[in-house]
């Protein structure tokens, strides 16, 4: 009996030993394909979507392997992940693994330092070489790059903003930044720091010297969508709606001579102090009259929005200005009355201007107005504006001599007589903004205006002929007017205005 028990015990141990050896000697993993897997055998997905690329597989034991793939993730041409394997009842193997990548993606426009990218893979592989592979990639590395044109969808205050450039960068997953180029009013470049990348997108907020910026966004199909909500710093309370000044008439004392029916106030503010008392009083009154009759026909109000936009209620109807009114001013007949103006103002048809065509920002105690020239041209010309984009860019970024030549070619006129100083002034206004003064009165009126010296380049007669009758004809104002008249850009019925305009440069040096 004891002998039988001994045999039974030996048999059990032998079976157990055989079973253990059988498990240890399972070499089925060695039958798995090695190296590159044929494309027709790969079911490949990236973040849940089918994709293409090259897959390499190499099992190193029954429980482990390496999975490599090329040209799958933008900027990461070659990724290898160590995975754990588990054999299935049907002989196939399941595998999964995760790899943290601390290398920036290599793209055409960015190829440096180290953002964080997390890559996770899982799938199955059969001895016949059939592979199903799912890759998940998350982190700042997916966003790094330069976005513009068709790769950027940018909104500013819920309105599309085109023609801009955004650079997404990072040194690691906790230090992500976005560079905005000429997007925030008054700032050539703005860096958004502390960008939080999570849940398939990014978000954050940044304070600059001029504004507070909140933003959200995401990237899909190589296109970056960025939404900006901007609030301008406004310590002087300039952000509000302004209506036009009242048109009032009265008697002015022009160097001892009363001038009845003169415009005292209007929608155009003009205050010009020169030695000649006649011109010091007469010319501002003329400008107030012309502006006071024309502006109310096209403009109802202007709003400086909290986000830096400038919007307006305007009319696109025709403008009426009778030549006889100008003659009346010249020969002392007085200005048209309030009743005449009221009949000129449209009673309906007022429109709200589009957003992102003009901006304001405070700087050095001045209110700067900056035009978005590409957007204005696009709004005016629609799809035809695209063909002008290179020319507009060359003008905005060119020097005075180049710009003069380009504009002359476009308008088919000779601009060579106009000074470089005038074009430098205009380019500075377009590229950097127009520096305006703001003055509030105790009666609640606001005057927004330019200093007289701002017009020096275009008003000063640089030739100063010895013949006093020709004073002013050497100014760029007179030359520009004559060029545009000769080219019929200015209509003939406005020709008489030069009689008024010439008085400005004639008296400017004083």
Where do the language-model regions lie?
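N-terminal glycine/threonine-rich, aromatic-flanked beta-hairpin/loop signature
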Residues: 51-82, 152-193, 257-368, 374-379
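Short, surface-exposed loop motifs enriched in S/T, G, D/E and P with embedded aromatic residues
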Residues: 81-88, 123, 190-200, 217, ...
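Post-signal peptide N-terminal segment of secreted/secretory-pathway proteins
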Residues: 66-127, 167, 179-218
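Surface-exposed or flexible loop/turn and strand-edge residues in extracellular/cell-surface modules
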Residues: 34, 39, 52, 64, ...
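Mixed-charge, low-complexity intrinsically disordered segments
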Residues: 253-294, 298, 318-349, 368-437, ...
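Bacterial Sec-dependent N-terminal signal peptides
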Residues: 2-6, 10, 14-42, 122, ...
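Short, solvent-exposed coil/turn segments at beta-strand boundaries
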Residues: 58-66, 89-90, 120-131, 169-177, ...
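Short, hydrophobic/aromatic-rich segments at coil-to-beta transitions
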Residues: 31-40, 62-68, 89-100, 143-149, ...
């Amino acid at each position: 009996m004891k002998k039988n028990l001994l045999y039974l015990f030996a048999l059990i141990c032998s079976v157990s030993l055989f079973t253990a050896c059988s498990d240890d000697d399972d070499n089925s993993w060695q039958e798995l394909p090695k190296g590159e897997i044929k494309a027709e055998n790969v079911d490949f997905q990236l973040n849940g979507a089918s994709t293409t690329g090259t897959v390499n597989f190499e099992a190193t034991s029954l429980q482990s392997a390496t999975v490599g793939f090329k040209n799958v993730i933008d900027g990461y041409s070659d990724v290898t992940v160590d995975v754990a394997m588990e054999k299935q009842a049907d002989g196939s193997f399941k595998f999964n693994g995760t790899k943290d990548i601390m290398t920036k993606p290599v793209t055409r426009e960015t190829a440096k330092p180290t953002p964080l990218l997390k890559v996770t893979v899982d799938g199955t592989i059969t001895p016949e070489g059939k592979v199903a592979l799912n890759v998940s990639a998350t982190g700042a590395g997916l966003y790094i790059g330069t976005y513009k044109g068709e790769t950027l969808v940018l909104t500013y205050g819920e309105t599309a903003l085109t023609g801009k450039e955004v650079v997404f960068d990072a040194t690691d997953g906790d230090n992500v930044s976005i560079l905005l180029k000429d997007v925030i009013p008054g700032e050539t470049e703005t860096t958004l720091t502390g960008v939080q990348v999570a849940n398939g997108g990014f978000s954050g907020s940044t304070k600059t010297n001029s504004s507070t910026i909140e933003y959200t966004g995401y990237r899909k199909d190589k296109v970056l969508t960025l939404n900006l909500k901007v609030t301008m710093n406004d310590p002087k309370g300039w952000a509000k709606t302004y209506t036009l000044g009242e048109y009032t008439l009265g008697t002015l004392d022009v160097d001892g001579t009363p001038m009845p029916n003169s415009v005292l106030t209007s929608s155009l503010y003009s205050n010009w102090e020169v030695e000649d008392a006649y011109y010091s009083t007469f010319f501002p009154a003329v400008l107030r009259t012309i502006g006071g009759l024309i502006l109310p026909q096209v403009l109802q109000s202007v709003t400086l929005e909290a986000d830096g936009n400038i919007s307006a209620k305007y009319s696109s109807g025709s403008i009426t200005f009778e030549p006889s009114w100008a003659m009346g001013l010249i020969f002392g007949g007085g200005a048209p009355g309030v009743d005449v103006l009221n009949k000129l103002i449209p009673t309906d048809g007022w429109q709200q201007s589009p957003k992102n065509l003009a901006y304001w920002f405070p700087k050095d105690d001045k209110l700067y107005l900056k035009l978005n020239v590409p957007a204005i041209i696009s709004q005016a010309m629609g799809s035809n504006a695209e063909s002008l984009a290179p020319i507009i860019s060359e003008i905005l970024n060119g020097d005075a001599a180049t710009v003069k030549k380009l504009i002359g070619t476009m308008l088919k006129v000779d601009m060579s007589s106009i000074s470089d100083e005038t074009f430098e002034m205009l380019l500075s206004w377009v590229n950097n903004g127009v520096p305006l003064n703001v003055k509030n009165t105790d009666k609640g009126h606001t005057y927004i205006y330019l200093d007289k010296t701002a017009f020096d380049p275009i008003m000063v007669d640089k030739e100063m002929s010895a013949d006093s009758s020709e004073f002013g004809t050497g100014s760029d104002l007179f030359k520009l007017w004559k060029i545009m008249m000769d080219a019929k850009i200015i209509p003939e019925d406005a020709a008489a205005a030069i009689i008024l305009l010439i008085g400005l440069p004639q008296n400017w040096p004083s």
